[in-house]
């Protein structure tokens, strides 16, 4: 099953902060890079800069690390 922009996916990379969480595909890079799928999440991760709110709401994954839902 091919993943496309706008699809909802479950993260299968065990070392990821978002493991087994769901997100929406924001973009897919066709240039041949390893982690070509950018996924956007509803909540931020724990990587905030000292003294500021928030963290990352997107992360890049390889297609094999994602499960389309």
From Swiss-Prot:
Coiled coil regions, renumbered to chain: none
Highest taxon of the lineage: Bacteria
InterPro entries: Elect_transpt_acc-like_dom_sf (IPR008990), PSI_PsaE (IPR003375)
Subcellular compartments: Cellular thylakoid membrane
Entry membrane topology: Peripheral membrane protein
Gene Ontology biological process: photosynthesis
GO cellular component: photosystem I reaction center; plasma membrane-derived thylakoid membrane
Keywords assigned by UniProt, alphabetized: Membrane, Photosynthesis, Photosystem I, Thylakoid
Pfam families noted in UniProt: PSI_PsaE
Chain's role: Stabilizes the interaction between PsaC and the PSI core, assists the docking of the ferredoxin to PSI and interacts with ferredoxin-NADP oxidoreductase.
HAMAP family for this protein: PSI_PsaE
Name under which the protein is recorded: Photosystem I reaction center subunit IV
């Amino acid at each position: 099953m091919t993943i496309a922009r706008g699809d909802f996916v479950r993260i299968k990379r065990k070392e990821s902060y978002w493991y087994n969480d769901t997100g929406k595909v924001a973009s897919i890079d066709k240039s041949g890079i390893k982690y070509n799928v950018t996924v956007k999440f509803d909540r931020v991760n724990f990587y905030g800069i000292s003294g500021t709110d928030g963290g990352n709401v997107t992360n890049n994954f390889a297609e094999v690390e994602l499960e389309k839902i």
